[in-house]
Amino acid sequence: MIELTLLTLLNYVGDNFCEYRYLGHDNYKSLLLSYSDASNKFGPLEVKKVIEKSENFQVTAVAIAAVKCPQHIVK
């Protein structure tokens, strides 16, 4: 199994976040659903490990979401 990286996780979550926002869910629900999807794909312990080891997680996550679907981030 390939090691999950922060960039891989956030790109996957970012794509799903945008899809959930397009469906009309608010930011919080979209985020929770996206991380739930990531846990299903990569395994909850792998997702947790990447999050725990990451620094500047919030900045990186917001930057990726802003690039993927800025209309839902920048208001």
Q: What residue ranges belong to the model's regions?
A:
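Short N-proximal segments of mature Sec-exported proteins
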Residues: 2-49
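Compact alpha-helical subdomains of small soluble proteins
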Residues: 29-75
